[in-house]
Amino acid sequence: MSDSPTGPWKSMGHIMDRTWRTRGNHPGIIEYKGQSYVFGLNYDIMHLKTFRHHERRSVSAAPMYYNADGSIKKVPYWLDNVLEQVEPFNPFRKVEAETMAWGYGLKTIETGSDIYVSNIDEGEYLMLKGVDFRKGASRFEANVSNSRGRTAYIEVRLDAVDGPLCGTLKIDPAKGFKTVGCSLKDAKGVHDLYFVFKGEAGHDLFVWDWWRMK
């Protein structure tokens, strides 16, 4: 800590205490809409599958607060924090498919300036938290490429992977990317949004660029 950007500096200790769960020394601090956040690395997602050590770190975030003298209050370990959603998510616009709070099984690929969701297999899903459908969404559209020769589907569900089904988007085989849509029902208010993937091919069902609600 210092009164000058060029020092002299005084060490004030750790922002987050070292424990067996903490790994890496690559933090980042930002301020977003009046709230400070600290980012860092850990193995928590890898530990959902195995505790055998290998380098599969993921990024976590936590709210960060300052004392009156400008020093930083100690931040609890990532999983011990409550990270509140800043505001409801707006689905009534073009949303890149790789936007997610959680994804199961799928991967992303980068092609030039574009990023796509790929490696989509039967039963996998993508989830967004706190999506505000307002008074109701009546249509879901997605820009996809299905070159597998077998029909695929995106189920639009609320609040759980097996939650209420609002609509099912059918993706027929075709060359290149195309925009397809389906009608929705009972999609209103604020919910967690699940896109659940099904398909006759079983694996590598399609590649997904973007989506929007209407």
Which sequence ranges carry the predicted segments?
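Carbohydrate-active catalytic/glycan-binding domains of CAZyme proteins
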Residues: 1-214
